[in-house]
Design a protein with these regions (language model features):
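Structured, active/binding-site neighborhoods that engage oxygen-rich ligands
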Residues: 1-153
Length: 153
């Protein structure tokens, strides 16, 4: 993946940090406030969050991106799909939908990308897109790098 990082561009560290913080906070707030509605397909009766939540609950939309940050901290920028699979097995415990099937497949010895699709009726769900922001956050002005990370994911 090294060739996708060779492009240089001017980067204002303060502006970059502000944009990442804004993106992360927006995702955290949206995930927290949207959690009670997740998966519901009927008309919603919202109470406008009275009282407003004071904290968050476990949220796969955020938690999985923290696992990817851990992978980056321990493995560096040249992550492989196998690095991500090891992190998945070590740190992801969500048993439902595509996550549970992928974990079971990895434990059976199936490797990516087969581990994510084999016998996985949920493989077209939103897990991957919903956790993709992290790749954009770490690849400012480098859409090809972000795309490569997302592909590995």
């Amino acid at each position: 993946m090294a060739d996708v990082y060779e492009r240089s561009f001017p980067l204002n560290p303060a502006a970059y940090a502000d944009k990442v913080l804004g993106g992360w906070l927006g995702k955290a707030i949206g995930g927290t406030l949207g959690a009670p509605c997740e998966g519901k397909k009927s008309k919603l009766s919202l109470n406008f969050y009275d009282p407003v939540p004071e904290g968050s609950v476990p949220n796969d939309d955020l938690d999985l991106q923290l696992v990817w940050l851990h992978a980056l901290q321990t493995k560096g920028l040249n992550l492989t799909v196998n690095d991500l699979a090891k992190e998945w097995l070590a740190h992801i415990t969500y048993p439902f939908d595509e996550y549970g099937v992928a974990i079971a497949n990895l434990k059976k010895g199936l490797r990516p990308p087969i581990s994510g699709s084999y016998n996985n009726f949920f493989s077209e769900c939103m897990g991957s897109p919903i956790r993709s922001e992290i790749w954009g956050f770490i690849s400012p002005a480098q859409p090809l790098a972000a795309m490569e990370y997302a592909f590995q994911d």
